[in-house]
Amino acid sequence: MLLNHATSSIAGLNESIVAGVIDQRIRDAYVTILSAVTEICKGHLGHPVPIVIHGYDYPVPDGRGFWGGGLFPGPWLEPGFRRKGYTQMGKRKQICVKLIDRFNTMLEGLAGNPPFEHVKFLNLRNTLLTDATYKTWWENELHPTPKGFQAVTKKFAAII
């Protein structure tokens, strides 16, 4: 849905779908939640409380899922890339960077601007490495290792 086929004349992200999903639907969901929390706090405390919102780091879509199962054990990203003809890891990572940047830009645009002056944006991009050592930072396609969580935790501690 978000991704055109690699052999298509319009390969890469489907801009109109990405805009509709991130810039409209997901943004609207964040506005709804932030507005509700803000109004509840104003009603009960007389003022909004500080809120931290955060995006994601750049994942490595290598097909590693969550060991131990669960409802959604993964892999989450690699199968979609494979079905759409993206076999090269470099191209997959480039597409993930564009998508994650778009999501983070949307969040950053909400934080600190009316009516969300009390909302701070935490940028987690480039916290976890995606180079040859990425498996020491990423447990799977979406979740950090303990070492990765320590790096993320330091960023949260700094903003709180």
Over which residues does each language-model region extend?
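Histidine-centered active-site loop/cap adjacent to the catalytic His
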Residues: 136-160
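Well-ordered, non-membrane alpha-helical segments in soluble/globular domains
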Residues: 12-38, 93-107
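Substrate-gating cap/lid alpha-helix
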Residues: 62-120
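Acidic carboxylate-rich catalytic motifs and surrounding loops in phosphoryl-/glycosyl-chemistry enzymes
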Residues: 117-134
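Hydrophobic, aromatic-enriched interface-forming segments
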Residues: 24-78
